[in-house]
């Protein structure tokens, strides 16, 4: 049985991973502040003909649209065509985020998801065990719906390692370090 693989359609990156990543994988995209994690996530969504979802726990939807505009990406048009769903969510109300993501997947038949960021979300969850459970639930949701996902995590300047909480890399299927 062959594994379906998903290309990112990002020049330079696809040369590093020429076959793409396995469909339904959850990839950790991590790096220091200002390394282009949000832009990478947006590029992953806008460069694909498949519908996608961008979930933001920090930036407003207007900020996300403005960032995309600087690269010539018309997110509003994609939203109007049901090729993209932007979701701004308050991390203080985490209990129903999985339902919101599930409903968004069904509404536009999404195949790609970007969560920006697990760092912001995790700071409101607090306990590492709860963060790990939430990450596993997200991974299960993505697999169940045959989506391919990116979760963004910021590396704090004072931390050694590749993620904020030190657990994200153990719950995801692959890591991209910017």
Where are these regions (language model features)?
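P-loop NTPase motor core
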Residues: 96-171, 175
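Residue-level signal for alpha-helix termini/capping positions
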Residues: 18-21, 46, 106, 143
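Residue-level preference for the first positions of well-ordered beta-strands
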Residues: 24-28, 51, 111-112, 148-150
């Amino acid at each position: 049985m062959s594994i379906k693989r998903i290309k990112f359609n990002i020049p330079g990156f696809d040369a590093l991973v020429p076959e793409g990543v396995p469909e339904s994988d959850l990839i950790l995209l991590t790096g220091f502040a200002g390394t282009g994690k949000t832009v990478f996530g947006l590029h992953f969504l806008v460069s694909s003909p498949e519908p996608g979802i961008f979930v933001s726990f920090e930036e407003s939807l207007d900020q996300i649209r403005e960032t995309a505009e600087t690269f010539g990406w018309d997110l509003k048009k994609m939203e109007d065509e049901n090729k993209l769903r932007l979701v701004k969510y308050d991390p203080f109300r985490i209990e129903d985020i999985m339902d919101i993501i599930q409903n968004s997947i069904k509404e536009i038949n999404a195949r790609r998801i970007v969560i920006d960021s697990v760092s912001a979300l995790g700071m409101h969850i607090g306990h590492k065990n709860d963060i790990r459970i939430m990450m596993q639930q997200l991974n299960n949701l993505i697999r169940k719906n045959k989506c391919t996902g990116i979760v963004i995590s910021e590396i704090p300047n004072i931390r050694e390692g590749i993620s904020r909480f030190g657990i994200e890399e153990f719950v995801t299927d692959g890591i991209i370090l910017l």
